[in-house]
């Protein structure tokens, strides 16, 4: 009987056992962009996973395909009611399919449940698809910085947004138009 490959691709909380897979994913993305790869300097947070990404300090989520990590994102609590999004990576063949959005939404849910009101992130200027996603999800680009001494000559953009309540798609439950009237077909008897 032929084996059936499992292709769940759902967003799930990461375990410490996922760290090698996350590091492999980041190495694949670095290779795609022809970045210099040194895990000791590029992913120190992952090498101290529990300190950075265990509740209540933070959280980490992954997407797996056939047991292999193919997507990741982390969030770490900062000062006051602020958190920082880290490590949003997806294998190239999965980009543009909504999985990046699902990963960021998992971070936003964690922030809401943790009383976080503001989310920030830094992203390499070369990650255009990620920037488009962040902007579609309500993040604002606020500044740029160069990373001194970085072998990849990295310049990063800072993005931020208020966490706020969950945002529903137009026409979703409870959605209203500019007049304040509900969107969608009228309810019977209305």
What are these regions (language model features)?
Residues 5, 9, 13-87, 91-93, ...:
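Acetyl-CoA-dependent GNAT
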Residues 11, 96, 120-123:
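Conserved SAM-binding loop
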Residues 47, 117-190:
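C-terminal "cap" of GNAT-fold acetyltransferases
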Residues 91-97, 125-126:
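Active-site acidic-Proline motif in GNAT/NAT acetyltransferases
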């Amino acid at each position: 009987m032929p084996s059936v490959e499992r292709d769940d691709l759902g967003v799930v909380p990461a375990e410490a056992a996922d760290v090698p897979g996350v590091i492999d994913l980041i190495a694949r993305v670095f290779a795609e962009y022809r970045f210099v790869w040194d895990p000791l300097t590029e992913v120190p947070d992952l090498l101290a996973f529990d300190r950075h990404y265990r509740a209540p300090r933070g959280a980490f989520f992954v997407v797996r395909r056939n047991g292999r990590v193919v997507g990741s994102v982390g969030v770490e609590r900062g000062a006051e009611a602020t958190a920082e999004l880290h490590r949003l990576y997806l294998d190239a063949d999965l980009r543009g399919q909504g999985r990046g959005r699902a990963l960021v939404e998992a971070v936003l849910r964690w922030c809401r449940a943790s009383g976080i009101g503001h989310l920030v992130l830094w992203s390499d200027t070369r990650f255009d698809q990620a920037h488009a996603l962040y902007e579609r999800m309500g993040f604002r680009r606020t500044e740029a910085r160069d990373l001194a001494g970085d072998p990849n000559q990295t310049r990063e953009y800072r993005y931020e947004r208020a966490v706020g309540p969950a945002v529903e798609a137009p026409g979703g439950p409870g959605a209203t138009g500019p007049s304040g009237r509900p969107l969608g077909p009228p309810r019977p008897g209305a």
